[in-house]
Amino acid sequence: MLIIKNGTLLPMTCESLNADIMIDGGKIAAIEKDLSSENAEVIDASGCFVTPGLIDSHSHIGLMQTGSPERDHNELSDPIAPELRAIDAINPFDCAFAAARSSGVTTCITGPGSINLIGGAFAAVKTTGYVVDDMILRNPAAIKMALGENPKLRYSEQNRSPRSRMAEASIIRKALVRAIEYRNAIEWSEKTNGKLPARDLAMEALLPVLSRELPLKIHVHRADDIATAVRVADEFDVRYTLDHCTEGYLVTELLKKALVKNCQGIIIGPLISYSGKYETAKKIDFKMPLALYEKGIPFAICSDYYENPVELLRVCAALSAAEGLPSYEALKAITINAARITGISDRVGSLCAGKDADIAIFSGDPMDCRSRCLITIIDGNIVYKRSHLT
């Protein structure tokens, strides 16, 4: 049992709170003033800020090893590969997980890259553990889809389709139609006691998307690709997030309409790269969060690790605040907004009794880049403690 005392809480249910947190059995047991227990270890957070553990809403952590040429995030054998599963490639010993813990990041949504049009299943994982199966918060968390430069350029190099944006959308539509036909064949065989169709792992992986149990996680940068993503998703009435959404500030009315229908959120980032990427030429960097906020569009900020180091997630939010985004909104983008958009807010994203005890303690305002992460707690266990707390 742990009790965190004397800190300034930023619970994400209100802007700030002066109270203690009791942790028991890996969960937040209580948030009240003057908590005590004979059996509890006490953490004195005087002068510190206490937040929910930070959430990286789009990452490839564990699939791209820091400092290594190994890359397990893209499979170039087929542009339609929804059956791929991130958990089969995540390396818990990737040193980026330690970097995440040292910066207060407790959950990452990690998965396949953007080479394939439909690239496989993302997973929400905690950033501590030795076996990925023990780190899972939600699996699968989403199915990756990608539009734009990456799929057509990579497959053009192999003299294969897609070679154009038209082909990208067409191939995705065909895959979703195949999945519908596969579902219909299963339902018909069950209804008539007939023979089941041969098992198809790719189509099977898309069934939860068609039933709206799982969202598509759609990689998009250009405004026209954003429009195509919305168009195709609405044609098949599937849920989705728009990830990166680099030119989203140019089509805010489209985004607002999409959020009313099937889009469950916008995930922006990385905010510190892509300087040489043609389709991100209109990138507005740290002004992007403010542009969406001013239009009333909720969003999360991601690192897109390996593109940005995961330990810079908080820095990206803080630099967005420096561009005029209210600090509280910046923190929401890497806590509760990230949790809501990725479908894990029942477990993480805010400091509430009953939620997972994933907590970060900072030396000062977390939206001040000079503040340091002092302690990180995951599932009630201290997984990082700064050696010099001053």
Model regions: which residues?
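Active-site gating loops and adjacent loop-to-helix segments of metal-dependent hydrolytic enzymes
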Residues: 67-90, 131, 142-158, 195-196, ...
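His/Asp/Glu-enriched, well-ordered alpha-helical/loop segment
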Residues: 66, 71-76, 81-84, 215, ...
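Histidine-rich, glycine-flanked metal-binding segment
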Residues: 9-52
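Polyanionic/metal-chelating signatures
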Residues: 101-240
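Active-site core of metal-dependent hydrolases
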Residues: 86, 183-285, 300, 340-342, ...
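Divalent metal-coordination and catalytic microenvironments
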Residues: 7, 21, 26, 47, ...
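C-terminal cap of metal-dependent C-N hydrolases
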Residues: 5-11, 340, 352-390
